[in-house]
């Protein structure tokens, strides 16, 4: 049995639109035949910056194999988006499109190798943004190397500056699973990154590294919507550590005697966490440690516990949480007569937040020829005239901005699909079940 992938570009001869096509095959060979066991095909429209990007307030992504990744600023007049291994920014008020970062140069096909990706971290009201670039570096200072690069794009100066680079000897698929949810810089010379189970604090002046915590699993680390707050479990004490990235101060929520606290998530800037008894901790069939929680607390940004929910009186304990918009669903378990834990009905929590009218909305539209296409619709004012396309320059610097992240402190198990993608799991049993 073998698996292979193919990538190529096709052009619509009538409209000159270009598409990136990727095909994956899973084959079995015998002495007389070849069997096709699985086949998938993905098609993505390639952005054409030479054309007017927005018409009638609509930015069309066209045919895409998955939902476009984008981030908008609070005023919703600037949007950053990722397209075919490149990072773009569009300012509706200025009618300005900028290619923030990308390896493709239109001349060398090797620059189109897409074993890398971006993560948008922040877009401010000027259109400037922070972002991560991770994977294999096709060109530039780190050409031929793999790693994670933290960058800042200045929309007013049209420049991109590398803040630091973490080298890696792992594959792109493995690196994608090793980057935690925390990646932020506060504009005052400090940055934070969760990498391979270590919580790193980086001094951007001398690029020294302080490891705030080790053995931090992805399920234990929670980050607020804005990146202002991050919380994780201290497995030694059972406490919760809470980092304010604006000040760099780490505070603690202390567990009581015989108790263990667990982070569950953030609703905007409010932390959701639970408390359980250490004697109730058990290991499930997949070999994963489970911690039933007898109560759940919501703590606001100021550090005040504003709401508390206790379920043990109903015979229920919380085992997990799902957050969708303003609704919190708590997954529950109950203790059976033989002492084992069984699934129980979930408990909902309604969260009240300020109503907000979205100027930017992503939707799908139907077309007779293309079928479903993704469109980003803008409800504000757009500057008329020809679209500006300024050149974004890289900031040159002397010396090195490579940081030493230390050894990995968390073991991950990767399950690979036949198309080359991978999913990371905390236990071997989970990885085998997925595969």
Walk through the language-model features, giving the residues of each:
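Exposed beta-sheet edge and beta->alpha loop/turn motif
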Residues: 2-33, 40
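A short hydrophobic beta-strand element
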Residues: 2-10, 127-133, 271-276, 328-332
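Short, surface-exposed charged micro-motifs
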Residues: 24-26, 78-79, 120, 191, ...
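Surface-exposed loop/turn elements that mediate protein-protein interactions on large endomembrane-trafficking
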Residues: 34-61, 86-111, 142-173, 194-214, ...
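Beta-strand-rich domains and repeat architectures in extracellular enzymes and scaffolds
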Residues: 58-85, 389
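Repeated scaffold domains used in trafficking and secretory/extracellular systems
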Residues: 64-72, 108-124, 169-184, 214-225, ...
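Beta-strand C-termini and the immediately following turn/loop, strongest in propeller blades
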Residues: 80-85, 131-139, 151, 181-198, ...
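C-terminal, active-site-flanking charged/polar segments
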Residues: 262-273, 291-306, 319-329
């Amino acid at each position: 049995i073998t698996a292979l992938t193919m990538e190529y570009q096709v052009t619509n001869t009538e409209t000159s639109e270009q598409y990136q096509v990727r095909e994956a095959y899973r084959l079995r060979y015998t002495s007389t035949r070849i069997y096709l066991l699985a086949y998938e095909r993905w098609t993505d429209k390639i952005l054409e910056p030479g054309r007017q990007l927005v018409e009638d307030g609509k930015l069309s992504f066209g045919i895409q194999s998955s939902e476009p990744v984008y981030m908008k600023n609070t005023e919703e007049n600037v949007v950053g988006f990722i397209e075919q291994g490149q990072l773009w920014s569009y300012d509706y008020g200025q009618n300005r499109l900028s290619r923030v970062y990308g390896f493709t140069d239109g001349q060398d096909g090797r620059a189109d190798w897409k074993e890398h990706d971006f993560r948008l971290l922040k877009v401010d009201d000027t259109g400037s943004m922070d972002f991560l670039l991770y994977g294999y570096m096709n060109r530039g200072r780190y050409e031929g190397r793999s790693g994670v690069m933290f960058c800042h794009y200045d929309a007013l100066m049209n420049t991109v500056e590398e803040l630091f680079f973490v080298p890696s000897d792992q594959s792109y698929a493995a690196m994608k699973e090793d980057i935690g949810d925390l990646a932020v810089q506060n504009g005052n010379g400090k940055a934070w990154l969760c990498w391979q189970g270590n919580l790193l604090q980086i001094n951007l002046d001398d690029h020294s590294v302080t490891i705030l915590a080790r053995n931090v699993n992805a399920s234990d680390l929670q980050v607020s919507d804005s990146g202002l707050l991050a919380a994780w479990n201290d497995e030694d004490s059972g406490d919760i550590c809470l980092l304010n990235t604006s000040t760099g101060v780490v505070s603690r929520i202390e567990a009581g005697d015989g108790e263990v606290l667990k982070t569950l998530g953030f609703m905007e800037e409010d932390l959701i966490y639970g408390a359980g008894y250490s004697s109730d901790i058990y290991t499930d069939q997949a070999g994963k440690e489970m911690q039933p929680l007898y109560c759940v607390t919501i703590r606001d940004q100021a550090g005040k516990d504003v709401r508390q929910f206790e379920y043990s009186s109903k015979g229920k304990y919380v085992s997990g949480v799902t957050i969708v918009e303003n609704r919190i669903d708590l997954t529950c378990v109950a203790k059976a007569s033989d002492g084992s834990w069984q699934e129980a009905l979930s408990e909902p929590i309604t969260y009240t937040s300020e109503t907000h009218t979205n100027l930017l909305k992503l939707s799908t539209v139907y077309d007779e020829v293309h079928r479903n296409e993704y469109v980003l619709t803008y409800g504000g004012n757009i500057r008329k005239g020809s679209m500006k396309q300024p050149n974004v320059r890289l900031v040159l610097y002397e010396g090195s901005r490579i940081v030493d992240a230390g050894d990995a402190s968390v073991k991950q198990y990767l399950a690979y699909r036949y198309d080359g993608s991978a999913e990371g799991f905390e236990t071997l049993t989970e990885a085998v079940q997925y595969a």
